[in-house]
Every structure is written in structure tokens, then in C-alpha cells.
């Protein structure tokens, strides 16, 4: 098994029997103490964030992963039905695998699904940005458009995004799927 020092951000390891994604890994050497690695990880089964200190010589179980391109078709209860772009095989993906990205799933969007060595789904990676239409927001008056505030807006996927005052119903906006933040208005 590899040492924690060979693992990098984005790696997927088996920690306490469950798959975890390394969000950040920092090497620290405090005063008179031994060096250690401070790891911030995300449990891929529960979605919880975990912080742990690994000693420099500690070994970890790195999970061998396979990435495949899939296309989102429709929602079936709490699952998302995806189709393999090469074999056209359909699979059900649980909502927890998508995390916050579930709020921005549009029909026919292409995603990357990360599978573990045993074939189970570890995580789903959405495109960094998606273009969505604003379906509901408060109308802006002339005075509001001159100021630089934000207002809540509901987009076509049902997610709520804070947008600038000049955005109106029917506007198409670009949203960052990692943070859920407004990026820009799309001119069509």
C-alpha cells in the first residue's frame, strides 16, 4: 500500500472501510513534534466532511477507479437515470452520489461517473458550469438595476441562485455547479 505522502488532492482512498475523496492534504511539521499530514476528506457514501491527521509514514488504501461518460436522461424517484454514451446501457444513480450538483441536473447533460474497482458508483462529476433559465424572480425596478445588490431566483431545475438585480424571468444564466453561484448572463 502506498504512503500518505504519495497521495494527492482528488485521490480516492478507503478510510475506516468507506471510500473518501481527498479534498486537501497539507504536510505540517510543528516545533518539537513529528511531522504529519492534515487531510480534509469527503465520505463518498454519506457526503460528510472528515478531518484526520495521518503520520508521515502511515500507509493508505488507494482505490483504483474508472471514469466513464454518461448522459442524464430523467429522474426516477430519488434516483437519476443515466445512459452510457458508448454502450447505451442505463443505470440508476442515487442522489447522494451527486451531492449539491443534483440541483443543477438538466436533461441530456453529460457527466463523468467514477466507479470503484468493485463496480460501485463513488461520485458523479458534473460540468463546472451549466446554463439554466431563470423561471421565477422578483421584478426589478429602474432603481434596482443601478445598484449592485443580489436577489434570489429560481432556475429551471428548481435550484435557488442569488443573481444580480438586472436578471429577469426568462434570462439564461451560467452557474458554477460546485458552489451554486451565479457567474454571468448568457446572451443568446
Curated annotation (Swiss-Prot):
GO CC terms, sorted: cytoplasm
Taxonomic lineage: Bacteria, Pseudomonadati, Chlorobiota, Chlorobiia, Chlorobiales
Pathway entry: Protein biosynthesis; polypeptide chain elongation
GO biological process, one term: peptide biosynthetic process
Family matches, as PROSITE patterns: EFP (PS01275)
Function per UniProt: Involved in peptide bond synthesis. Stimulates efficient translation and peptide-bond synthesis on native or reconstituted 70S ribosomes in vitro. Probably functions indirectly by altering the affinity of the ribosome for aminoacyl-tRNA, thus increasing their reactivity as acceptors for peptidyl transferase.
NCBIfam families in alphabetical order: efp, PRK00529.1
Pfam families cross-referenced by the UniProt entry: EFP, EFP_N, Elong-fact-P_C
Keyword terms: Cytoplasm, Elongation factor, Protein biosynthesis
Localization per Swiss-Prot or TrEMBL: Cytoplasm
Gene name of the record: efp
Gene3D superfamilies in the cross-refs: 2.30.30.30, Nucleic acid-binding proteins
Primary location: cytoplasm
Protein's name according to its UniProt entry: Elongation factor P
